[in-house]
Amino acid sequence: LLGVLAFARACIFLAPPSVTTLASASVNGTFMPICRVETDQKKVALTFNCTYSAQDMQQLLEILKEKNVHATFFVSDAWAKNYPELLCTIHNAGHDIGGLWTTQASLSIREQTLTLENLTQRIDRLTDSETTLFRFEDGNYDNSAIRLIQESGGYPVQWNINSMDWKD
């Protein structure tokens, strides 16, 4: 149903305030995004990537409201540009909004910084809030991409369970 809209990712990254999360963890010298957070509570974070279409979004929002489920929507710059009213609707419904950022190795650090800034500014302007969560659209990242997000005051977030619905 929602495969056209976005692919859902369930990942544990929300935690009670007493848990400290580190976005700068590294494994063998590679910086890692937040994929989960240690907590004694049984919680999952339901996330959606919004990239191309807004098909089924109203139905999704109705289901989330009916079930009293909070989600985080990671939106690309193009999606935010094409569906600004819907972005505001999602935000006003109490869901978190994060940036869905595409990194490209062919771009210079300055060009990557500009794409991240453009994405952040568009979301911030439309939602009248500060964007601090970022996800890599294709799941690919490197140390410089993680560093750019951290230097902007943001947190890189990925998934740890992939629904694979994008294959349908």
Regions found by a protein language model. Give the residues of each.
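Compositionally biased, intrinsically disordered/low-complexity regions enriched for serine, proline
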Residues: 13-14, 30, 153
